[in-house]
């Protein structure tokens, strides 16, 4: 067992294609950088090998909109159930079809493949593109298919308690759906990434030369020397954090990638572990990269931007 990477969860970015274009979307920039969807056979192999080798607690499929490719999603979760992964999640915008029969068919197939958690994004942003009556039909179909846990997952701006036009709209939408026996997950906060940097600047925090925080403090991050979750990209690359890739499972066995992971052998990771964002800046300067003089909204944005600037110098 690798002391730096003890896999408890695996996530699949099935696709970065989407049938919406939400104004806050963080993943839209990935749409043209990857194949249309992950290879089904590769995904199956990864789930089988990782599920048999490690005691995984959960698996998730997401996107983009993963249910643009329901067959792939179902194959992934059927194998996950077969190897004993207990929590099998799909996060979706709920826009599977305009046809009620097709929506019910997809929900039935998801249930039969072993999906036991459906997380539906509902908020002011998604409902600019996804009709509420479709969301209702999707949620009802999931309940009828007896999927164990169905939840709403709203995105809040600044905080759930902040009184702004987007949060007010989100609360109105949730009110419209409250007759359904579906829990609210509590949701997440809008991240200063992707389209939010263009469309929602007025709601972003002030930029700082070195934003506060460290890996593990920020949602969806972990200390780089104590990773519990890996993400599989549509091209097979394996990420331990945003754009931090440790190899490609289509070229190297997934178990070998996991077992050989050593963040102290990756200079930028080593710098972050030992000295945080200041360490990353010092490392970047040795490579001829200067941080943005205007600063950054978050440590994640800072880390990603600096590493991408370094890659452009190659």
Question: Where are the language model's segments positioned?
Answer:
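Flexible mid-to-C-terminal extensions adjoining Fe-S/redox cofactors in radical SAM and related proteins
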Residues: 243-314
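Conserved alpha-helical substructure of the radical SAM core
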Residues: 1-92, 97-105
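Radical SAM enzyme [4Fe-4S]-AdoMet core and its adjacent flexible, acidic
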Residues: 108-256
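A general structural motif
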Residues: 7-9, 54-56, 85-87, 113-117, ...
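N-terminal [4Fe-4S]-dependent radical SAM core
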Residues: 1-11, 209, 280-286
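Residue-level signal for mature regions of secreted extracellular proteins and peptides
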Residues: 11, 15-18, 234, 293-296
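Short cysteine clusters
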Residues: 18, 22-25, 236, 241, ...
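Short, flexible loop/turn elements at secondary-structure junctions
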Residues: 16, 65, 94, 124, ...
